[in-house]
Amino acid sequence: EQQQQQQPQNRRFRE
């Protein structure tokens, strides 16, 4: 969860 807030780009990788 913290990674998503710090790195929005990570959100694309998780999806």
Swiss-Prot record:
Per UniProt, the keywords (alphabetical) are:
Chloroplast, Plastid, Thylakoid
Record has Chloroplast as a keyword: yes
Gene Ontology CC = chloroplast thylakoid
Superkingdom field: Eukaryota
Q: Does the keyword Chloroplast apply?
A: yes
Q: Where in the cell?
A: Plastid, Chloroplast thylakoid
- What other note does the entry give for this protein? On the 2D-gel the determined pI of this protein is: 5.7, its MW is: 24.7 kDa.
Q: What is this protein called?
A: Unknown protein from spot 114 of 2D-PAGE of thylakoid
